[in-house]
From Swiss-Prot:
Assigned protein family: Belongs to the intron maturase 2 family. MatK subfamily.
Keyword vocabulary terms for this entry: Chloroplast, mRNA processing, Plastid, RNA-binding, tRNA processing
An individual GO BP term: tRNA processing
Cell compartments where the protein resides: Plastid, Chloroplast
Species name: Pinus clausa
Keyword Transferase: no
Protein name per the record: Maturase K
GO CC list: chloroplast
Length: 515
């Protein structure tokens, strides 16, 4: 497989045309078997690994024989092990076959993605998840509307196979993929004749399907946007007096020639910026309201035409940043006007000029966070702390560490917001819930627990908070702290929380459209 990957660009045509013979190689299933054992051993203790997890080349040869006969009744999602355990719901060999299928399908796309990234010179692309917040601060204040879209999960298996045919010319290699997709759809008893492609399924096959599906959507969408938009991506930061700058442009255009109109007009073209966090892409638009409506209509037609998906209207919502708040990852986002007083001294006289700039204002969603803490049994619906009964069997250090980790994640993630007063309410809920949990464990009162532990409650997080506040409000950084924020971007830790309350917001939007 490594030699096959190292063939390079010259043999890319051969790789796309002759993938099917790889399914007849026993080494391929041995590699997939080792990868499956590595993943399963990390999630299960070693004593839970049975003798059925041993690789049997006899079974592998039987599966290869079925593929040679192009038998479309390959059983993958039911237990086909000759000596299975009674309580096992998934077949060990089906996982190995899925791993092998994924390895074969990843070959052309790994080469395609490598050379597509190397040849990307026209547009700037940032793939790091930590580039989301700098993008929001840089692009959102100079946009007047955003489109909040959701990538649909449900898609017909045949649509996925047809999209694979655009990149893989070896038609026989797609037969096992078609069999797997249809069998998975039938095993889930889906009445809508479609499969659910989600990024949260912890298997390499479905993660590959999700990444390919998103890549296909974005590649087609970007190519259409480039054709329809002739503007250049300019930095608005170099034009602080942009209002007066546009007034000067109007006078320049009257006396300019035709060959110079394009370079001047590019400054007034609508700007479209795209960012995606998980399954939620956001498009920031600088233009008239009619342009926003056209973009929203185009997204709905795009999904219906290319992927034969009927997208509900609530899946693509438009917001005006000056009036409404948008949600992106775990924040309520809005744009506020920030007047800056600039004083210039010239010829011993003082001139005062007021510059009004826009900046992103992320708001901490206190009410959704309290609702999620209520679902996790840290408090009730009104926000009153209660004891976490499921943690009373743990040691005192484990209980303190868990509450400490929750608070540090919340505080670090939402430190990018200027107004963090609501976080102290969350700290009060967690600290009192921790005290009640310890009191319930030791069958005592909260007063006794606080008297015994004292500053041990959230000691680590409090020290972090004090260091952060001392850095933020020191004498040297006091003036700078009013204009700057610190993004800790502890996204992997806070991701479940952000996704959970995002589902609550989606349900509210769906209810509004249903009414």
């Amino acid at each position: 497989m490594d030699e096959f990957h190292r063939c390079g660009k010259e043999d890319s045509f051969w790789q796309q045309c002759f993938l099917y013979p790889l399914f007849f190689k026993e080494d391929l299933y041995a590699i997939s078997h080792d990868h499956y054992l590595d993943v399963s051993s990390s999630s299960r203790p070693m004593e839970h690994l049975s003798s059925n997890d041993q690789l049997s080349f006899l079974t592998v040869k039987r599966l290869i024989g079925q593929i040679r006969k192009q038998n479309h009744s390959i059983v993958l999602f039911v237990n086909c092990d000759p000596n299975p355990l009674a309580d096992r719901k998934k077949s060990f060999y089906s996982e190995s076959v899925l791993e092998a299928l994924t390895l074969v399908l990843e070959v052309p796309f790994s080469i395609w993605s490598k050379y597509s990234v190397e040849g990307m010179n026209e547009s700037k692309s940032f793939r790091s998840i930590h580039s989301i917040f700098p993008f929001l601060e840089d692009k959102f204040p100079h946009s007047n509307s955003i489109l909040d879209a959701r990538i649909p999960y449900s898609i017909h298996p045949e649509i996925l196979v047809r999209t694979f045919r655009r990149w893989i010319r070896d038609a026989p290699s797609l037969h096992p993929l078609r069999s797997v997709l249809y069998e998975y759809r039938n095993s889930t008893e889906n009445l809508q004749r479609s499969i659910i492609v989600v990024p949260r399924v912890n298997t390499r096959f479905f993660l590959f399907l999700w990444n390919y599906y998103v890549c296909e959507c974005e590649s087609i969408l970007f190519s259409r946007l480039k054709r329809s938009s002739h503007s250049r991506s300019l930095s608005h930061g170099s034009f602080p007096q942009r209002t007066h700058f546009h007034r000067k442009i109007k006078h320049i255009i009257i006396f300019s020639r035709r060959n110079s109109l394009k370079s001047i007009w590019s400054l007034k073209d609508p700007k479209i910026h795209y960012v995606r966090y998980g399954e939620r892409p956001i498009i920031a638009i600088k233009g008239a309201h009619l342009l926003v409506k056209k973009c929203r209509y185009y997204l709905l037609i795009f999904r219906q035409f290319y992927f034969h998906l009927w997208s509900e209207p609530y899946r693509v919502c438009s917001h005006q940043l000056s009036k409404n708040c948008s949600s992106s990852p775990g924040y309520f986002l809005r744009v506020r006007m920030n007047p800056i007083l600039v004083r210039t001294k010239m010829l011993d006289e003082l001139f005062i000029a007021d510059l009004i700039t826009d900046e992103i204002d992320p708001i901490v969603p206190i009410v959704p966070i309290i609702g999620l803490l209520a679902t996790e049994k840290f408090c009730d619906i009104s926000g009153r702390p209660i004891s976490k009964l499921s943690w009373t069997s743990l040691t005192d250090d484990d209980i303190l560490d868990r509450f400490d980790q929750i608070w540090r994640n919340l505080f670090h993630y939402y430190s990018g917001s200027f107004d963090r007063d609501g976080l102290y309410r969350i700290k009060y809920i967690l600290s009192l819930s921790c005290a009640k949990t310890l009191a319930c464990k030791h069958k005592s009162t909260i007063r006794v627990v606080r008297k015994e532990l004292g500053p041990e409650l959230f000691k680590k997080s409090f020290s972090k908070e004090r260091e952060f506040d001392s850095l933020r409000f020191s004498s040297k950084a006091a003036a700078r702290s009013q204009r700057e924020r610190i993004w800790h971007s502890d996204i992997p830790q806070i991701n479940p929380l952000a996704n959970s309350w995002q589902k609550i917001q989606d349900l509210k939007i769906e209810n509004l459209f249903d009414q």
